Amino acid sequence: MPRFKLLIEYDGAPFVGWQRQANGFSVQEAIETALGGFTGESVAIHGAGRTDAGVHARGQVAHVDFSRDWRPDVLRDAANAWLRPNPIAILKAERVDDEFSARFSAVRRHYLYKIINRRASLTLEAGRCWAIRRSLDAGAMHEAAQTLLGFHDFSTFRDSECQAESPLRTLERFDVLRDGENIEIHVAARSFLHSQVRSMVGSLAHVGSGKWRVEDMAEALAAKDRRRCGVVAPPEGLYLMQVDYEEA
């Protein structure tokens, strides 16, 4: 069966997350319904990242199999037509070999977390970032973030309902960059635990506000105790930006 790789962008606000769920409409369900609509097939797509409710994506990747071959541009355009008015776009479709897996072939996932740090309420960016009114020290946040780089037990920053077999992960990038009122937090790893990024970002916000010292971040990590986590950052500031694969 021909296999296709899809590059996907979406606004996560209206959805219960990427994965199909009984309690609401998911991104996966919307795309499967659209693909099934124009192909006449019952299809299943497999994503690289299972984003939570409210989390956005600019570079989600999925793979899907069909019983017949399609021109990639026809597949992309037909899928987008059937997806309207859902806030989901198939940016690219390409034919891949049968061994390719959007999830298991991935070697790195890149996330961006956006904070707007100002007293005034949000207008244009509402629902697209975390609005924090109290002044944040982005330099201290970046310093604290560096203590989490490398291979660690991230139990402190793991959701209590996380189903991963191991809390061990290798964090490859964790940078905090400020440009005026905008704070961007860039994170990269091969894989993440459930709510790991939002848990780490929420804890960094404690550092930025002065509630935590820089050293408290490393101490929270070392505790391997979920109760030592700071707040969990809201989902609307998180974006799955890119998924990397080994070049063929």
From Swiss-Prot:
CDD domains: PseudoU_synth_EcTruA. Pfam families: PseudoU_synth_1. Keywords: Isomerase, tRNA processing. It catalyses: uridine(38/39/40) in tRNA = pseudouridine(38/39/40) in tRNA. Substrate binds at residue 111. InterPro entries: PsdUridine_synth_cat_dom_sf (IPR020103), PsdUridine_synth_TruA (IPR001406), PsdUridine_synth_TruA_a/b_dom (IPR020097), PsdUridine_synth_TruA_C (IPR020095), TruA/RsuA/RluB/E/F_N (IPR020094). GO terms for molecular function: RNA binding; tRNA pseudouridine(38-40) synthase activity. The keyword Acyltransferase does not apply. Its EC number is 5.4.99.12. The active site is at residue 52. One of its GO terms (biological process) is tRNA pseudouridine synthesis. NCBIfam families: hisT_truA. Belongs to the tRNA pseudouridine synthase TruA family. Formation of pseudouridine at positions 38, 39 and 40 in the anticodon stem and loop of transfer RNAs. Homodimer. This is tRNA pseudouridine synthase A. The gene is truA.
